[in-house]
Each structure stands twice: as structure tokens, then as C-alpha cells.
Amino acid sequence: MGLLRLLVLCTLAACCMARSPPAPPLPQRPLSPLHPLGCNDSEVLAVAGFALQNINRDQKDGYMLSLNRVHDVREHYQEDMGSLFYLTLDVLETDCHVLSRKAQKDCKPRMFYESVYGQCKAMFHINKPRRVLYLPAYNCTLRPVSKRKTHTTCPDCPSPIDLSNPSALEAATESLAKFNSKSPSKKYELVKVTKAMNQWVSGPAYYVEYLIKEAPCTKSQASCSLQHSDSEPVGICQGSTVQSSLRHVPLIQPVEKSVTVTCEFFESQAQVPGDENPAVTQGPQKLPQKNTAPTSSPSVTAPRGSIQHLPELDDEKPEESKGGSPEEAFPVQLDLTTNPQGDTLDVSFLYLEPGDKKLVVLPFPGKEQRSAECPGPEKENNPLVLPP
């Protein structure tokens, strides 16, 4: 029996000493030159602020955007050229029209029931020694907040309506007429309605925002020749009409309607007093396509980016969202190149010294390998206004 035990132990020892051939090493992913940064880092927040300021300046219509949180950020450091940042920003629409050119700090996000929210992707170039701040490209996608979900939270809150609603146009016309009646000399005309909401108070109520322009005739002119109709808007008004419900009053008494209006006039577009960071505007407003997409024809001129407005998610047809991931609710694409090795972007016009100055631009990164500190903390933590 002892001999048998010894034989078993020797067999086990031999098995333990036997080695299997080593597995082949796994192929290593090449190191990316894009360095992930924390989304709440003070420098990152400053870069995000510069980028969003430039996005707002590039708009000719709509409302200014504010930063809700940094969703993702990568930095590509390029020696004497400085850094190119790849930013994904969650944004909220503010109460400031882009034509007002107000400072970002003076603009406030809208109430939750009228919120417009979304996501922007942007590339932003910084060269601190040369004092260069430049936005080569951006794209944004925005949606209004879900009316169904806001009504669940606040059933009596105002609800956004279509800008072409006849009652909204009537509210704009009547409130502007009231403003003109109090204007000492100039008259103003409606350009277009930019926001519209309705609510039941003591009766139907309509709240509108609209752009105005100077009318070709003043109040003192009985007749005058018409000016060109494409004059620029000079201000924005907020008007409302509230019609009282008087069912308990005899029919001989007319229905009461309350009309309110306030208007704000835009400052000169030539210079914005007190505007921060003038270096952000270095470079032309519109660039040849060769500076924004190296493989395109140099004769084509295109803007640096765009803002896409989509309907609220509840308004989409089932087949439009069927099978889609949550990220597809805010499709934002920003690829100046699809070359994994990158392409060059000529930014010589930003620099005073002679010689070519080129940035290496890589495909915009996805979620892989982003910082564990992203997304960052949000300013408005309402889940109704946070993209996935």
C-alpha cells in the first residue's frame, strides 16, 4: 500500500512539472496620440468655453448655447504647433438670441418645459506661446425637450407650439402693434417668430418671441417709398396675449384680452464691448475648403460647421427610431478625415511668422479609451435635458 501511494505522488509531481507551450502574445493596439483628459479639469472647461463661444459667434440665426457638461475630451499635442483638442459637449439653449452678441455669462438656460438641448462635437486648436485660439470645425445636434415628459412633471406649465401656428402669429402681431403705439417716432415690422408657447390661464394664453426690423416709414410720414425688404433685424421682442374666460358674465360684455410686450434692441455688430478673449476670433470667418478638409477642392468655400435641429424624440415615427441605440438620438458627425494616420490642416494664416504651419488632424475619437472622469458633472442635472 505504501508503495502504491509513493507511485501516485510521483505521478502527480511529474504532471505538475510538465509545461504547456506558451500562448502566442496578443497583438497590441498601437498607442493613440490622442490623450484622454478629465472632463472636469479646469483647463478642459476653459477650452470648452472658448470653443462654445466660437460656435455661438459663427451663427446668424437661433439662440446662443451654454455648456451643461463636458462629455468627452482628447488632446493631441503637436510639439511647436501646440495642441488640437477633440471635444464632445452637452449643451443647452439659452434665452439670448445670437444676434444680441451678449457675453455668455449674461445668458441663462431656459425653463425646463421649454428647454432645447443636445450635443456638439468640436475641434479646437490652442498654441499658448503664439497666443492662438482657433476653432477649425464643429457640428451640433439639438432637440426640444419631450412635451409628454414635461407635462407629467408639470401639467399646467406652458407648452411649445409650432412657430407657424396662427394664434402665435396673432400674438406677435398684436403685441408689436402695442409696442409701435408707444414708440415716439419709429415703427417696427415683424421679421419672424422665433419661439411660441401656449397655456390655459383664465383662458387661452400665447407667449411668443420674435425678431423685428425698422419699418420703411416713420409715424410722421403719410406716404413714403418702400425700402428694401431684406433689412437686418434690429431687435427681439417678447409678447403675450391672455384671453379671459367669462362664461359667468352676460354675453353683452366683451371678452377681455390682456396684451404685454417688451423689446430689446441689438448692439452694433461691428464691436462687442466687454467681450472676452479676442484671440478666439483670429482667422477668417469663412475658410477655403482646403483648410478644413485637406482632400477637397481649394476653390470650394464652406462654413466651419452647422447646428442641426431635430424634432423632439416623442414626435419621431416608430420606424425612425426602431433598433437605434440611445446615442443615435443625437447623431453628431465630425470627421475632417477618415485616414487613421491623419491628414494635415493648413493654419498658416493664424501665425505672423513666415513658413507653413500645419496641424495633424485625426478621425474624431469614439468612446473607447476615454477618461474615467468623463462625462463630467452637469450644471443642469435634470435627466430630461441630458443626451445619452
UniProtKB/Swiss-Prot annotation:
It is found in: Secreted. Pfam families: Cystatin. Residues 1-18 form the signal peptide. InterPro entries: Cystatin_dom, Cystatin_Fetuin_B, Cystatin_sf, Kininogen_Fetuin_HRG, Prot_inh_fetuin_CS. Residues 279-300 have a biased composition (Polar residues). The keyword Signal applies. Belongs to the fetuin family. This is Fetuin-B. It comes from Mus musculus.
